[in-house]
Curated annotation (Swiss-Prot):
It is a multi-pass membrane protein. Part of a membrane-bound complex that couples electron transfer with translocation of ions across the membrane. This is Ion-translocating oxidoreductase complex subunit A. The complex is composed of six subunits: RnfA, RnfB, RnfC, RnfD, RnfE and RnfG. It is an enzyme of class 7 (translocase). It comes from Pseudomonas aeruginosa (strain ATCC 15692 / DSM 22644 / CIP 104116 / JCM 14847 / LMG 12228 / 1C / PRS 101 / PAO1). It is found in: Cell inner membrane. GO terms for cellular component: plasma membrane. Pfam families: Rnf-Nqr. It comes from the Bacteria.
Amino acid sequence: MTELALILVSAILVNNFVLVQFLGLCPFMGVSRKIETAIGLSLATTFVLTLAAMCSHILQRYVLRPLDLEYLRTIGFILVIAVVVQFTEMLVKKTSPLLYRVLGIFLPLITTNCIVLGVALLNANKAEYGFLQATTQGFGAGLGFSLVLVLFAALRERIAIADVPAPFRGAAIGMITAGLMSLAFMGFSGLVRP
């Protein structure tokens, strides 16, 4: 139980996939203008990350490794992620048509979000991870992505009404804000030993 808690805290704060490992930066910068959109995408991404971590672990452990087909890992994981994203898209469309319209093109683009493939590949490289650890890592990565995306969206909403000097408006202030958030998350680096 302690190991799972450490994996969760590590994925959310210490080794945050967005601010520490720089994965998932496209949706981080692109969908963070409004907090409602950020919440919707973060929930969908967390769901996809968790399911993709589960499915890719099963694929790696019970198909690719026993059959000595590990060289097909990336292609297999991309196919698994595509199926999980399609399932998520259908689920969101049925349960929340408004959220489906708000997310628009960003929902199918979760397939190409590098954080999803990155988590699957990192889990596959950790041979000591069992099913629960891989799932916890995926869920923690999703929670970390959600935390950072919602915080960044809230900051961008505040910055949008602030008096920002002309040269810093738009992407420039966004990058500065992301850098400051990354520095803040560096403070968690001593929380969990490697």
